[in-house]
Structure formats: C-alpha cells, structure tokens
Amino acid sequence: AHMRVEEDSAVGRADAVVYMPDAVFVFELKYDGSAEEAIRQIDEKGYLIPYSADGKRLFKIGVNYDSTQRTISDWIIRED
C-alpha cells in the first residue's frame, strides 16, 4: 500500500490518494467547509475516474477541519 498527496486528475487535484491491493481511497480535505462539499468536489472533478478501470473498490472520503475547534468536525466515507 502507498499514498500520494496532491494527485493530479484531468480537471483537478485530489488532496490524497491511498492505494491498497484491492481498493483506492480518494481524500478531499476542506478547511472550515463541509464534508459534503468535499464529496461533491470529488464527484464534480472526476477524481475517481483514473482508477475506475482497475477493478478495485473505490472510496471517496470527504473531511472538514474546523479552525475554531481545531479538530476534524465532519467526515463522510462513500463507496462508489
């Protein structure tokens, strides 16, 4: 398994991609936004497209960091 940060796609850049033998996890991180906004960005910018032909399970993970609380305030994990 390995991880890449700022992984380029055709129309954007995923914050992090984790490659496992049977799955790919695409992370989008927001700062004072929402996890739902992060998931939307993964969908709208097609961050999963480069991995769709590999036959692996695909996961999108949206995470929001709240600067006031100084912690992760929200996250969503969805299998595509």
Predicted regions and their residues:
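Conserved helix-loop functional segments at active or binding sites
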Residues: 1, 47-51
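Extended hydrophobic-aromatic, low-complexity segments
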Residues: 2-7, 24-28, 36-38, 54
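Mg2+/Mn2+-dependent nuclease catalytic core
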Residues: 31-48
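Active-site metal-binding core of divalent-cation-utilizing nuclease and nuclease-like domains
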Residues: 1-21
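Domain-level recognition of nuclease-like catalytic cores that cleave nucleotide substrates
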Residues: 50, 54-80
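Structural beta-strand/beta-sheet cores of well-ordered domains, especially the beta-sheet scaffolds
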Residues: 12-14, 25, 56, 61
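Conserved catalytic cores of phosphodiester-cleaving nucleases, focusing on short active-site segments
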Residues: 16-31, 45
